[in-house]
Regions:
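Short, Lys/Arg-enriched N-terminal segments with co-localized hydrophobic residues
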Residues: 20-33
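Short beta-strand/loop segments at the ligand-binding rim of alpha/beta enzyme cores
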Residues: 316-326
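Gly/Ser/Thr/Ala-enriched C-terminal appendages of enzymes
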Residues: 33-65, 69, 78-80, 317, ...
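N-terminal, Lys/Arg-enriched amphipathic/low-complexity engagement segments
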Residues: 67-123
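Buried, small/hydrophobic-residue-enriched core segments of structured protein domains
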Residues: 33-66, 75-77, 113, 119-128, ...
Length: 517
């Protein structure tokens, strides 16, 4: 299904957004209408304290107050050099359809926490904020504001949990997948993770994130239908075990799918029966039909050794074009090890360690208040901590990326919102972790990393094609991100610097906060 068509289907929630329920469907209609999968009102997806604080602001007559919150993360999973920003489109769709229906209001009333004036106000609520964000698929680094919400205070508070849920999950999986794709060194990678995902949403949106991160396909059919991701798959051991013998299982499969026969060869013994029976199937079934055996899959054992032996046997049988697919608890480290040992593998099916990011399964993006609007003025706010990394970057700001003459990104830069730095000559940046140091750059190019994507609760552009987001990731990695930053171990540290004016403002706020404390 084309990506645009899928988007129109799965988010056809207009009736619900207006407080109406779709007409009841017959069982057959429920089976075929996939709009029902995502036609869910998730406005109540929040921590209780978000609603409790919103009620408090309402009682304090703060409905008209505005605030600014930044989304950023502090640490890249697996000790990586960068992360991939994913989940933005789901955030924008959530915000655009945010409302509270009768069932939501009735449940909130049952908690006996909130008064009727507030519940009546909620019944007519819509999100009216602005969102500034990096494009989805952007390379991002710790502590920089990848997304900013400028909104009425209550609006901005209510949406924290849902925003972080979507950004954290998809950014985690996209980042992990990209590591796996890099380890595969140009070989195809497929997402095989649905059955080990934490639930259906994690499988489906994890597949979306994996595709953004560079996976070529997914085995999850629902994700293919919803997002237009290419789907792929072979057979299970049960197919082989159900038939009288391995050869019969292979023969029947090849007869049914002569153009896409990939045979699972490790049900009994890879080298003694699996590969020989695959070769026999190619010779006795496919070649007489004018077809070729597309591939074999090995799902257990010593993948490096077995793939080399299988390759030798296939080549000796004249099946040099037959591909070898490997699966079985793979990640970037096992894939790299297999290839370092000379493993003859053309494609990897990666499951649980991709879809759950098993080695480091928490992304850790946060949502912090950085400014309060008082009339026409905007007062920056800062959170201090005993831990340097948890001191927030205050105020409304701009985020830039600096490039050398060859187009490689050398630093990111935070400036005050109203700054217009002159980058035509030499410019000194402050390293906030080592403020005695100055990074001086001259004759470099610079571009802003974020754009206004939502105004007054309405998106300003159509959702991009998922394949274009995926291509954007690849283009950045190929042309902007230093190979040294892409190392798995001890990657080069990407600088996040501050303009002198911004750093001065932050230090003044820190001093003021310390005096108040």
């Amino acid at each position: 299904m084309p990506h645009g068509a899928a988007k129109r289907q799965i988010f056809r929630v207009g009736a619900i957004a207006q407080g109406k329920r779709p007409a009841a469907k017959t069982p057959r209609e429920e089976e075929t209408d996939m709009t029902q999968y995502d036609a869910r009102n998730i406005s109540m997806m929040m921590d209780l304290y978000e609603m409790t604080m919103a009620h408090g602001y309402f009682k304090e007559d703060k409905v008209g107050d505005f605030a600014t919150f930044d989304v950023f993360y502090r640490r890249t999973p697996d000790g990586g050099g960068f992360a991939i920003f994913a989940g933005l489109e789901q955030v924008l769709e959530y915000l655009e359809n945010l409302h509270f229906d009768e069932r939501d209001i009735e449940y909130l009333r049952s908690l006996k926490i909130y008064d009727e004036d507030f519940l009546r106000w909620l019944s007519g609520y819509r999100f009216h904020g602005d969102v500034i964000a990096m494009p989805e698929g952007s390379i991002m680094y710790p502590d920089e504001p990848v997304m900013t919400v400028n909104a009425p205070l209550i609006d901005a508070q209510l949406v924290e949990t849902a925003i972080l849920t979507q950004i954290n999950h998809q950014s985690l999986v996209a980042t992990k997948t990209q590591r796996i794709v890099r380890a595969a060194q140009g070989r195809s990678v497929a997402d095989f993770g649905a059955r080990r995902a934490h639930n259906i949403d994690a499988a489906v949106y994890g597949a979306r994130a994996a595709y953004i991160g560079g996976a070529d396909s997914t085995a999850t059919v629902l994700a293919g239908q919803m997002f237009g991701i290419p789907v792929s798959g072979t057979m299970a051991h049960s197919w082989v075990m159900y038939h009288d013998d391995e050869y019969t299982a292979f023969r029947r499969f090849a007869e049914l799918y002569p153009d896409n026969a990939v045979l699972l060869v490790d049900t009994y013994n890879v080298l003694d029966s699996g590969v020989p029976n695959a070769i026999r199937t190619a010779n006795e079934v496919l070649i007489p039909m004018g077809k070729r055996l597309k591939g074999i899959r090995i799902d257990s054992g010593d993948l490096a050794y077995l793939s080399k032996e299988a390759r030798r046997m296939l080549d000796e049988a004249g099946l040099t074009d037959c591909k070898i697919v490997a699966s079985n608890s793979l990640d970037e480290f096992t894939i790299r090890s297999i290839l370092d040992q000379g493993g003859c593998i053309d494609s990897f099916g990666v499951g649980e360690r991709l879809i759950t990011a098993k080695s480091d399964p928490v992304f850790g993006a946060v949502y912090k208040l950085v400014a309060v609007h008082e009339g026409q003025a905007c007062r920056p706010t800062i959170k201090i901590s005993e831990t340097f990394e948890k001191i927030t970057n205050p105020g409304r700001k701009q985020l830039w990326r600096v490039y050398d003459s060859d187009g490689w990104a050398i630093a990111d830069l935070i400036t005050k919102e109203d700054e217009s730095p002159d980058f035509s000559g030499a410019y000194a940046f402050v390293d906030p972790q080592k403020p005695w140091k100055r990074h001086v750059f001259s004759n470099h190019t610079i571009r802003g990393l974020r754009e206004l994507v939502m105004k007054n609760g309405k998106r300003l552009r159509p959702a991009p094609q998922l394949k274009d987001i995926r291509s954007f990731v690849k283009r950045q990695l190929d042309t902007e991100v230093w190979p040294e930053e892409q190392r798995f171990e001890n990657p080069h540290h990407h600088y996040l610097d501050m303009s002198p004016a911004y750093y001065k403002m932050k230090m003044a706020l820190l001093k003021e906060a310390q005096q108040q404390g």
